[in-house]
Regions:
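A short alpha-helix-loop-beta-strand transition element characteristic
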Residues: 97-103
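Short acidic/histidine-rich motifs immediately flanking catalytic phosphotransfer sites
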Residues: 73-75, 170
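A short beta-strand-loop structural module common to alpha/beta enzyme folds
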Residues: 54-63
Length: 238
């Protein structure tokens, strides 16, 4: 299992496309939404244990990754937090080329675990620093749909970037995915949140035969166990 930042793709396209076929056959490149960072390593481990080739995960915001794919960046599969980004990536896709809703996530308001108690009214407290995702990326669109207009102090390009601001002590509150909080002992939900929609439905596209095999793996009990173990839901929310 290897990770690459999304920006690295820009500089490695030529080298990747020139790599020998035998080398390519020993790995599967998966463009992966940054909100799946914590789970993709375990998914790759299960996949590789079952005999699949090494996974090279290219991590980044869903919109940014989709743009790179449209510009010709080589990949075998694309895991996105925005199913709409799959439109136009494939021409006449077969059913096995697309998986919509292999996992679901929802938003929570997070804060550093050593912070004082908060309540929903604090979202409009101008004395607190509130960080959220920018509109136009999946977490930002979901934030707007759920919470409406908020006095946000800093808009970030991804939920991971919001988490980083919280980790660094640069924000009092941040709107992130429930799985982000579950993965970090230093963060807690600012107040109890019941799972609520609008939810984020993760989707996947296969761009090669190896990618198609990886998508089939996502629909196995082993993959679902990994996803639920990281706090994702694998059935559509009611």
């Amino acid at each position: 299992m290897r990770f690459l930042p999304a920006l690295a793709v820009v500089f490695t396209v030529t080298l990747a496309t020139a790599a020998c076929a035998a080398d390519d056959a020993n790995r599967v490149t998966v463009f992966t939404a940054s909100s799946l960072t914590d789970v993709v390593d375990d998914l790759a481990e299960r996949w590789e244990t079952a005999g699949g080739p090494e996974v090279v995960a290219v991590l980044g915001g869903s919109n940014h990754l989709a743009a790179q794919l449209r510009d010709g960046a080589p990949a075998d599969a694309f895991l996105t937090a925005d199913a709409e980004l799959l439109n136009g990536l494939l021409s006449n896709p077969a059913p096995a080329d697309l998986v919509r809703g292999f996992a679901y996530n929802h938003l929570v308001v997070a804060m550093p675990s050593d912070g004082p108690g908060r309540n929903p009214g604090d979202l409009h407290n101008r004395d607190l620093v509130l960080v959220a995702c920018a509109q136009g990326v999946p977490c930002g669109d979901a934030t707007w749909a759920r919470f409406g207009d908020l006095p946000v102090d800093s808009y970030e390009p991804s939920a991971r970037a919001v988490v980083t601001r919280l980790d660094l002590g640069e924000a009092d509150l941040g709107i992130v995915y429930a799985t982000d909080v579950a993965a970090r002992p230093g963060l807690v939900q600012a107040w109890p949140h019941d799972p609520a929609c609008p939810c984020v439905a993760y989707a996947a596209a296969a761009l090669t035969d190896r990618g198609r095999s990886f998508l089939a793996f996502l629909d196995t009990p082993a993959a679902r166990d990994v996803l639920t173990g990281h706090g994702f839901v694998t059935e559509p929310p009611s």
